[in-house]
Amino acid sequence: DYYHKQNLLKSDLLYKYLDSSEGFYQNMTNPKNRSRTNINFLVDNSQDISKEFVEKAKQNGIIGLEHHPFDPLKGCRVSLYNSINLEDIDSLINFMNLFKGVISTRSPRAFD
């Protein structure tokens, strides 16, 4: 059905970005066991940078990226519920790309 196809597209798009990020965004789940609804990742192999990522995302209007409070050591989580559309995933990936560049160069004004 429509929502199933949309969820496949959204999760495929995000997993492809994570997998192509040269290890900056790390999803530790075996590809054959990956969820289509909740996608976990760690940012730059660091809890501190993952927290910074979540805060900067909030400042840029992207919310709900915190991991489950019972397991915060896993970094970030994107929940791809039906209300999230492909444009939302594109916006998230654009932000992730910007954040990766900022952290790589530590350009302090990139988010201004």
Q: Residues of each region from the PLM?
A:
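Structural signature of PLP-dependent enzymes
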Residues: 1-12
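Alpha-helical scaffold segments in carbohydrate-active enzymes
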Residues: 13-17
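Conserved C-terminal alpha-helix-loop-beta "cap" of PLP-dependent enzymes
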Residues: 19, 23-91
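Short amphipathic C-terminal alpha-helix that caps PH/PH-like domains
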Residues: 92-97
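Short, hydrophobic alpha-helical segments
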Residues: 100-103
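Short Gly/Ser/Thr- and charged-rich N-terminal loops/segments
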Residues: 108
